[in-house]
A protein has these predicted regions:
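Active-site rim helix/loop that mediates acceptor-substrate recognition in acyltransferases
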Residues: 33-62, 71
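Conserved GNAT acetyl-CoA-binding A-motif
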Residues: 96-99, 118, 125-150
Length: 195
């Protein structure tokens, strides 16, 4: 497998947003997110993201095809619902980087691309003066009816990267899941690493 992984910034991010939107819709449709993606919402969300100063999109290319992507930007440029749990606990978000989605098509998993995504995002965070990074992962019950029998959570991978769950630090985000008529609120657990 010959995959090129590289960070995109500025105008390069804008050029890759359609690919990122399609990847989000495709990858997040699966468990544990079960996201019923909406192209209009994706365009708005990603345009906001691309406008954030110091944002980076790390893309994985198989030839010219984007097969994976991961995003990061300073937490202070994220929406209030992402910042609020930190601010409520008195955590300074001015030197905190938020790692957004990390999406990779299934055929490309298990080849070190996830590590490359973290390496590039962490490097951008350090370049921008951050002393910590965080991300949020959806919380699902162990007996969730949509959970595949062979599902393997990423907790051990994240822990090997130096990230840990921050107890009681969660956000609530709403999205429409497959089979539902309306959005429902989901709990997102924050993981964090300092350096």
């Amino acid at each position: 497998l010959s995959i090129a992984v590289r960070p995109l910034t500025g105008a390069e991010i804008a050029a890759a947003l359609d690919d990122l939107a399609q990847l989000r819709i495709t990858v997040f449709a699966a468990y544990p997110y079960l996201y019923d993606g909406d192209a209009t919402y994706e365009a708005e969300y990603l345009a906001e993201y691309a406008a954030a100063p110091d944002a980076v999109l790390v893309a994985a290319f198989d030839g010219a095809r984007v097969v994976g992507a991961a995003t990061a930007a300073p937490m202070m440029h994220q929406k209030a619902e992402f910042r609020a749990p930190f601010e409520a606990r008195g955590i300074d978000t001015s030197r905190l980087f938020y790692f957004g989605e990390s999406v990779l098509l299934p055929d490309y998993r298990g080849h070190g691309i996830g590590h490359a995504f973290f390496d590039h995002r962490e490097a951008q965070a350090v370049r921008c003066g951050a002393n910590a990074a965080c991300f949020a992962a959806v919380v699902r019950a162990d007996d969730h009816p949509a959970k595949p029998q062979d599902y393997s959570p990423l907790d051990a991978f994240w822990a090997r990267r130096g990230y840990a769950v921050v107890p009681d630090l969660t956000a609530e985000l709403a999205w429409k899941e497959h089979g539902d008529e309306a959005e429902k609120v989901n709990v997102m657990q924050y993981w964090m690493r300092t350096w």
